Amino acid sequence: MSSPGDTAVLVLAAGPGTRMRSDTPKVLHTLGGRSMLSHLLHAIAKVAPQHLAVVLGHDHERIAPLIADWADDLGRPIDVALQERPRGTGDAVRCGLSALPDDYAGVLVVTSGDTPLLDADTVADLIAGHTATRAAVTVLTTTLSDPSGYGRILRTQDNEVTAIVEHADATESQREIREVNAGVYAFDTAALRSALNRLSADNAQQELYLTDVIAILRGDGLPIRARHVDDSALVAGVNNRVQLAQLGAELNRRIVAAHQLAGVTVVDPATTWIDVDVTIGRDTVIHPGTQLLGRTQIGGHCVVGPDTTLTDVSVGDGASVVRTHGTGSSVGAGATVGPFAYLRPGTVLGDDGKLGAFVETKNATIGTGTKVPHLTYVGDADIGEHSNIGASSVFVNYDGESKRRTTVGSHVRTGSDTMFVAPVTVGDGAYTGAGTVVREDVPPGALAVSAGPQRNIEGWVRRKRPGSAAARAAEAAEKAAGGRPAGEAE
């Protein structure tokens, strides 16, 4: 049984979002590494309401499973209610009430699912203010320089809220009002239920407006309150991709600033993008053109960038990652990566290791202190500690049907242009000569050389490429040396 001290939150996410011009439901569009709806649910969960429900309509089959996943991540239940026909926000709330206990008598917060920057502090402040004043409804408002498209707040000369008029139904004088409805409310649930039963669709949209509840409750003589939010971005909604980009940039500005205040140097905030779930240690330097995405974790005293994109990558303390694209990988403490390295999923680079210029790795474990300096592909491989892989080497992992692994031991030295044809094992302390194709296992401490003796065919250029620049150069060199052209009889 509920009590007057309980809190419930309804998130309205049933609209089709046609102005997004997208096959993706509006609330699933992302900024800062999360969808708009996910941002909002994470914020609401911090308030810890007794009940949390989302009202879905358009594309509910796609959204509901994601809500279940987020509920698991947040460790709390999130109910789903369905608005089968789009009949306005008032009808959406009526549908949402079905997800609450019939006897629920606490505070009911209603918000839209397209306000991704709404934070827990703002919601908690709304609930506290509403409870303290014992109002029938408390509405969040904000002031905009361009209020086009927003419902306007109507007040008496005594500054009391009398109604909210939607933009489409507002008169010219009402459209001059810059204080707007933020779309976030706290209701006395009993009063709300009563008002919902008296809503009318006699308006420009022929819908049941939740905002009309304000005038109905005032007509009942019940107290109406408003709480103004100075930071309008916290309650800004998204209706199109221009607004999505604007809020995405604002969210990123706040994320970057928070890291800077926590001791991270961000050289150029304007070209640095950091998702909400990224962590960065103090005294790390982030250079221009860097994107840190997903659940990337950067240690302290690191150097990242410029022109680096890391998604779900962990980087240990003191590491350097320069001009690198990485996904689903791990870089050990003190390691160096780049420039122009490509870390594909499953890459694990040990402490003090090196992946140099134009190195690509995939599903590979590279041990402590091991160096892969340049121009090399390491795929499906395990390399031990303190080994060195020569330039232009390739771990040949695909036989045309399946991927196979290569194992290279510790303290191994391989020559340039070595091909490791998997499956093959190179033992500890072994060497390979330049140009070696390793098709069989190499014992520990052995030198593997696959090439035969070099054979020089004298005079080949003169005979096969007569008159060419190469032939003329060779003839001049031979004359300068006082010799007869190679291959010419005495």
Swiss-Prot record:
The active site is at 374 (proton acceptor). InterPro entries: Bifunctional_GlmU, GlmU-like, GlmU_C_LbH, Hexapep, MobA-like_NTP_Trfase, Nucleotide-diphossugar_trans, Trimer_LpxA-like_sf. One of its GO terms (molecular function) is glucosamine-1-phosphate N-acetyltransferase activity. Pathway: Nucleotide-sugar biosynthesis; UDP-N-acetyl-alpha-D-glucosamine biosynthesis; N-acetyl-alpha-D-glucosamine 1-phosphate from alpha-D-glucosamine 6-phosphate (route II): step 2/2; Nucleotide-sugar biosynthesis; UDP-N-acetyl-alpha-D-glucosamine biosynthesis; UDP-N-acetyl-alpha-D-glucosamine from N-acetyl-alpha-D-glucosamine 1-phosphate: step 1/1; Bacterial outer membrane biogenesis; LPS lipid A biosynthesis. Residues 1-241 are annotated as: Pyrophosphorylase. Residues 462-490 are annotated as: Disordered. GO terms for biological process: cell morphogenesis; cell wall organization; lipid A biosynthetic process; peptidoglycan biosynthetic process; regulation of cell shape; UDP-N-acetylglucosamine biosynthetic process. It catalyses: alpha-D-glucosamine 1-phosphate + acetyl-CoA = N-acetyl-alpha-D-glucosamine 1-phosphate + CoA + H(+); N-acetyl-alpha-D-glucosamine 1-phosphate + UTP + H(+) = UDP-N-acetyl-alpha-D-glucosamine + diphosphate. Residues 242-262 are annotated as: Linker. Keywords: Acyltransferase, Cell shape, Cell wall biogenesis/degradation, Cytoplasm, Magnesium, Metal-binding, Multifunctional enzyme, Nucleotidyltransferase, Peptidoglycan synthesis, Repeat, Transferase. Coiled coil: none annotated. One of its GO terms (cellular component) is cytoplasm. Acetyl-CoA binds at residues 391, 397-398, 416, 434. Mg(2+) binds at residues 114, 239. In the N-terminal section; belongs to the N-acetylglucosamine-1-phosphate uridyltransferase family. In the C-terminal section; belongs to the transferase hexapeptide repeat family. This is Bifunctional protein GlmU. It comes from Mycobacterium avium (strain 104).
